Amino acid sequence: MHTDTLEHDALARAGAHARIQAACAQACSAIAPAWPLDRAIAVNPHWQRTGQPLRRVAARMALLGGIQVFPPRERQREAWQGGRITPQDLALALQRLPDAAGLAEADCVAALDRPGGLQPLPLLIDVLDNDPARDTRLTWRQAITHQVSQTCAAFFDRAQADWQPERGPGLYAFWRDTLTHDHGIGTLMGLPGLHRGVQALPATREDAEAWAMHHLQLQGGAWADYLEAVLLTVNGWASWCAYLAWQAPEGAPEREHLRDLLAIRLAWGAVLLECKDDAAARQAFAALQAEWRRAPERLQQAEQALVVDEVWQLALELGYQRELAGRLVRAPGLPSAVPEAQAVFCIDVRSEPLRRALEATAPTLQTLGFAGFFGVPAAYTPLGTAARRPQLPGLLPPAMEVTDQLPDPGAAVTARHRRLAWAAQWESTTRWPGAAFSFVEALGAGYLGKLGGWLWPREQARDSGDHAGLPARYRPVCRPMLSGLSLEERAALAARVLKALGLARGAAPLVMLVGHGSQSANNAQAAALDCGACCGQTGEVNARALALLLNDAEVRTALPALGIALPEATCFVAALHNTTTDEIEGFDLDLLPPEARARWERWQPVFSAAGDRVRRERAPSLGLDARAAAGDLLSALRRRANDGAQTRPEWGLAGNAAFVIAPRSRTRDAELGGRAFLHDYDPAQDTDGSLLELLMTAPMLVTHWINWQYHASTCDPERLGSGNKLLHNVVGGHIGVFEGNGGDLRIGLSRQSLHDGQRWVHEPLRLTVVIDAPAAAIEAVIGKHSVLQQLLDHGWLHLWRFGDAGLERREGGRWFAQDAGASGA
């Protein structure tokens, strides 16, 4: 009998352990990754939750993390009262949403005057905080978040601190050891008995999870939700851990960091309970269990309460879609003349105004849109460094290498190493413990020049940083080129890219590959303004590598056998669109034949005129005078790009709202306001639908990520944005930022990226994707990819197509005609 009892207990413990492990894994799976500062790409922070309907996710985020997913009601009230949302938009939104059947227009309008926030479900640290006898400056939540965050900053830092700590076998072990030896934290938290709880901490993460869950004694059905709520209190660091896991191979230790973080944050609540075993704590504990027993009911109520917010979200989008549809159906199409030149731009929304201006200035120029990595899925290693960095979308792994090549690499590498070593030694000298006094007294005046450069910014050109430490004589001949590929592989890549660009036949004599990059000073989040398709880098490396490949004589000789008919005179030129100043810079011009160089030079006045046109279009949003002389306006933007005190060098992708996958004839001359991503696609050339599938599963997902990062950072800037840029402190050299000197790691966009000081510049609209393809072809792609089914069926984006009779929208798996003249069309 005794043996049977022991076996039963062992089985029960094993079952409980398995359920805890499953709940922890489920909670961790809900966290989206956040890329580091030097590779910053936009991410939908709800990406791991898109398998659920949007409103259900909004309800869960509100109750589990106090996070707002839909636009705040006060902003919707402004849009309603200002006429941005019309009565027709509201009526159509109510008609479109089946769950809004019981709502009247008057109910929706009345809801705008009521607070839209929902009370989150409490965590153990929250109910313990309700003890009236506790007197401290910080809540338990604030104190614990700060301690966990500082621990993570020390553990993950590999670049910033000169004195690195011993990290031990993992994040949980590091935290436990840190807490055990920190004898002052109990005093700071007003818990002199904290050491008792710390001593009770289990040695391993798995035991800590079981220990903490045993203390909580929640019903099994609430475990995963409670654990997800725990992670959301340190969502920034959780997102960083998710990124490390995203990048790591199976079985790597980096895949365990997120679970370690969950165990740390979970264990803190149990530690507090160990320290506060009194009547108040027991009463608070009972209240916690009562609240979480009602969690399923609370979630259902929250989802119903948010129906009105979903209605207003759609109403806001319908107003924009009406305008978009009208502009698309009025687009006049391409001119009949054969283009004298072609310019391939990134699909980025900032390319749209420049493409429009170039075509208006020179009708014989044809512009094309393509993902900014130009089909070169490479990692780039600058000359003489080990700094291998991705130059492709974050969803993809690098498949090839780009390295710098030049005539005398040995001498250049030696010279660069020498200069970089001197710079590193100088920097380390300034960080000596006594340097805070002696260095400033002796050499502080030497920094007056740098300070003056910020107070009176100059008009210096953009510096990519890839040539830092390289003597000037080597820079013009240092070229990023594909390496390690055979002629057959290089030719196949060239053919693949040319077909995707639509240039397999009839290329112009001059084809410009125009990447893009931003220019700013003293900006920790500068990479977020560069090319997302190049993993937060500029498109220079990809454009140059591809142009050099396509101009290679051996590759050109091999292309006809692969079905590519490039005219012999066609020459490719790599260029970069500076999105801060709207200037275009060319590269490797010294390698061009005389005829091609002459053609490039003839286009320079067109670039200048088009750039001036775009600068005047952008000037009012930047507080500049659009009527200023051309040179004065350009000078002002150049100085802005070098101003270390400028928190808004440009607006980035603020305002993004649509993605058009279609021939340029569908959008040419349509004034899309810099709000649309544009990718060229000709369905007639894609007979098997393979290119359409690629576009819907790569660029479409990237634009969705961008759209939702801007949406989330606007709707909840405190929890899903990075706060005030003026208060940013860089963590770990490149990991992310703190707002101030602590708190959670901040993810998302800063307030200055979305708000001009008076009003919000970005409108939180779900992306409207418009595709020129048969409905059957689109449905075939959707049917093959569950991620697309989830995004569409669960309301994360809108999908339209160009039909024979006009625009059509997809709704509930069916296609409906759009009337471009009707409200909400």
Curated annotation (Swiss-Prot):
Q: Which InterPro entries match?
A: DabA
This entry's Gene Ontology molecular function terms read:
zinc ion binding
Q: Where does Zn(2+) bind?
A: C346, D348, H516, C531
Keyword check for Transport, yes or no. Answer: yes
- Keyword tags: Cell inner membrane, Cell membrane, Membrane, Metal-binding, Transport, Zinc
Name any GO cellular component annotation: plasma membrane
Query: Looking at the record's lineage, which domain of life comes first?
Result: Bacteria
Tell me the leader sequence span.
Answer: none
Q: Which cofactor does it need?
A: Zn(2+)
Q: Where in the cell is it found?
A: Cell inner membrane
Q: How does it sit in the membrane?
A: Peripheral membrane protein
The UniProt family comment states:
Belongs to the inorganic carbon transporter (TC 9.A.2) DabA family.
Protein's job:
Part of an energy-coupled inorganic carbon pump.
Subunit annotation:
Forms a complex with DabB.
Question: What name does this protein carry?
Answer: Probable inorganic carbon transporter subunit DabA
Lineage of this protein's species?
Bacteria, Pseudomonadati, Pseudomonadota, Betaproteobacteria, Burkholderiales
Q: Which gene encodes it?
A: dabA
